[in-house]
Design a protein with these regions (language model features):
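Short, low-complexity disordered leader/linker segments with a strong preference
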Residues: 1-43, 155, 340-341
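N-terminal (or domain-start) structured segment
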Residues: 37-128, 167-169, 175, 191-220, ...
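An extracytoplasmic/periplasmic, membrane-proximal ligand-sensing/linker region
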Residues: 43-45, 229, 280-341
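Short, surface-exposed alpha-helical segments at coil->helix boundaries
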Residues: 59, 63, 180, 184, ...
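Solvent-exposed, polar/charged alpha-helical surfaces in well-ordered, non-transmembrane soluble domains
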Residues: 63, 67, 71, 92, ...
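Hinge/capping helix and adjacent helix->loop/strand transition within the periplasmic-binding protein
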Residues: 96-102, 109, 117-204, 253, ...
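C-terminal lobe and pocket-closing loops
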Residues: 138, 224-293, 327
Length: 341
């Protein structure tokens, strides 16, 4: 009896075609649920972890953006404050969460860019442990002094500091905090010597500057704006490239004409990140919602009134910012010899 033959195609070829077809079915079977899940996102409450105490800039930003996410998607957004260790405890919680888009971190320059250089045993990697979602806002630091200090501008301050090396103190919200590094960067740029006094939080540092226990602070605008407006502190300059809309009478440090401050910028910034491995479709969807919310008049006005500048951008650009800021602040940490408490 003649062997079985298929006209035009051999048995071996048929088996190869069958294997390829089955492989394709497996791929489609695996990919389909993930694709459908991404399309259905979000379908349950989203949690934004703020790694600081309630009431500060990150908390205000998280709640403002969370409200807009709810309006756009119909799902509730829960803001949870998990403070401690300079924000690294809350950040680590998000790094270890499921990468499904339902747990986000309101990241900060401190937790995402400064911490790797200050904390040698950091439990997460700011680049490898997270997926960038959306840069939310930049917050200029305001250089403010006690009202009785005999200086009216940055040039006079630098002259005073050089005439009195080591006799002027400044406060920050803690050793290795963003405000600490900003002032160290200012010191390096102006070649001045100012003594650092670390506090447990920004508020007591600001209040001691008002009381005259220390002479200076260089910290986020929201913390000092009320004291400047009431005349209890003198604002000499802001760390941003442009003047703030809400306090346009305060010049930028770059405008001071002081040698070393040309092009000076040391803003704080805040943005949402998700656990690494979160599907790109989800991070892109969140990015679009956040960017649209930042362009809304009500939220833009609210953020600016708090001293924050809306800063919508792509996840890719936000990722590049994080990486460049890690390098930048590492150089400051090394040169200043800053270590965690």
């Amino acid at each position: 009896m003649a062997g079985l033959k298929c006209p035009g195609i051999g048995i071996e070829n048929m088996l190869n075609y069958l294997k390829r077809f089955l492989a394709l079915l497996v791929v489609l079977f695996i990919a389909a649920p993930a694709a459908m899940a991404d399309d259905a996102y979000p379908n349950k409450p989203i949690r934004i972890i703020v790694p600081f105490t309630p009431g500060g800039s990150p908390d205000i930003l998280a709640r403002a953006v969370g409200q807009k996410i709810t309006e756009a998607t119909g799902v509730s957004v829960v803001v949870e404050n998990i403070p401690g260790a300079g924000g690294t405890i809350g950040a680590d919680r998000v790094a270890k969460a499921a990468p499904d888009g339902y747990t986000l971190l309101m990241g900060h320059v401190g937790t995402l860019a400064v911490a790797p250089s200050v904390y040698p045993q950091l439990p997460y990697d700011p680049v490898k442990s997270f997926a960038a979602v959306a840069l939310v806002a930049k917050v200029p630091n305001i250089l403010a002094v006690n009202a009785s200090m005999p200086v009216k501008n940055v040039a006079e301050l630098v002259a005073y500091l050089k005439a009195n090396p080591g006799k002027v103190n400044y406060g920050s919200g803690g050793n290795g905090s963003a405000a600490h590094l900003a002032m160290e960067y200012f010191k390096m740029s102006t070649q001045t010597f100012i003594v650092h006094v670390p506090y447990r939080g920004t508020a007591p540092a600001v209040m001691d500057t008002v009381a005259g226990q220390i002479q200076m602070v260089f910290t986020g605008a929201p913390a000092v704006m009320p004291m400047v407006k009431s005349g209890k502190l003198k604002a000499l300059g802001v760390s941003s490239v442009k003047r703030m809309d809400t306090m346009s009478d305060i010049p930028t440090l770059a405008e001071s004409g002081v040698k070393g401050l040309n092009g000076f910028e040391a803003d704080q910034w805040y943005g949402l990140v998700a656990p690494a491995g979160t599907p790109v479709a989800i991070t892109q969807k969140l990015n679009q919602v956040v960017n649209k919310s930042l362009s809304a008049q009500d939220i833009s006005t609210r953020l600016r009134s708090e001293g924050a500048i809306p800063a919508p951008t792509t996840p890719e650009n936000f990722e590049q910012l994080i990486q460049s800021e890690i390098k930048r602040w590492r150089a400051v940490v090394i040169k200043a010899g800053i270590k965690s408490e």
